[in-house]
Amino acid sequence: MIKQRTLKNIVCTTGIGLHTGQEVTLTLYPALANTGIIYRRIDLNPPVDFCVNIESVGSTFLCTCLKNNTYGVQVLTVEHLSAAQSGLGIDNIIIELNGPEVPIMDGSADPFVSLLLKAGIKELNSSKNFFRLKQIVRVEDGDRWAELRPFNGFTLDFTIDYDHPVVNMKNKHYFFNFTSKSFRSEISSARTFGFVDNIQKLKNCGFVLGGSLTSSVVMDKYQVVNSEGLRFNNELVRHKILDAVGDLFMCGYNLIGSFIGFKSGHTLNNKLLRAVLARRKAWEITSCIQGCDVSKIF
């Protein structure tokens, strides 16, 4: 068994919200064992807390949001920071922000991984719990689908399917065997992406107001617009895996199981997690994973 983790020190950063376009300061605090992941909006009076669990997930249109039904407010775009926390196996943290949205940074989880490592990781004197799959659960939406199945480890198998010259048979699929080390080297730096035609339509509707070439991969009808190009030939599908890592962390624990997704996104990932939780025999919270050395994963 391994121990729960939190931060050693307080750290902060400032950035722009992808959808709101607002500047926001993010401050991360250590937390006691069994606190869980708590987001706190201090721009509101009184400050409002959002505890990470599946029932707290609100809108999943274009991003994953957490809601507080008591106050009727949300915190937007938590998935990249959540992926970074999951990637480093952090169980307990308080995240203060002075605005409605987690900053987009460079469009990946890498700046958040660096921020968390700058704070330092501290072990607590309590066993780490995991969300372990015991049965296969699958959800579908037209030709899109997502599935979780039992596995003594954590793997993600993802396929995208865009009718675009940048996407081809060689870079539309990726299989990822999750460890903290492999997450940092293979997944965390993959950036969010969009298409020029869609971006202007979304801006007209009040979304992606903070989007830019420094915070996402942008493609016109033929190619990547960013002068630096892609970080990986298959950066797009790697980012979809990053999103899935963050979305699955909405259960509040690191997951032990195998995820398979075909054209899945935030909404279907959330639907899958809710379908799993609705089947009580399909999962368990446990600190002991027989047949799996979790110390090699985290």
From Swiss-Prot:
Pathway as given in its UniProt record: Glycolipid biosynthesis; lipid IV(A) biosynthesis; lipid IV(A) from (3R)-3-hydroxytetradecanoyl-[acyl-carrier-protein] and UDP-N-acetyl-alpha-D-glucosamine: step 2/6
Molecular-function GO terms, alphabetical: metal ion binding; UDP-3-O-acyl-N-acetylglucosamine deacetylase activity
Catalytic activity: a UDP-3-O-[(3R)-3-hydroxyacyl]-N-acetyl-alpha-D-glucosamine + H2O = a UDP-3-O-[(3R)-3-hydroxyacyl]-alpha-D-glucosamine + acetate
Keywords: Hydrolase, Lipid A biosynthesis, Lipid biosynthesis, Lipid metabolism, Metal-binding, Zinc
GO cellular component, one term: membrane
Purpose: Catalyzes the hydrolysis of UDP-3-O-myristoyl-N-acetylglucosamine to form UDP-3-O-myristoylglucosamine and acetate, the committed step in lipid A biosynthesis.
Protein's recorded name: UDP-3-O-acyl-N-acetylglucosamine deacetylase
Gene symbol of the encoding locus: lpxC
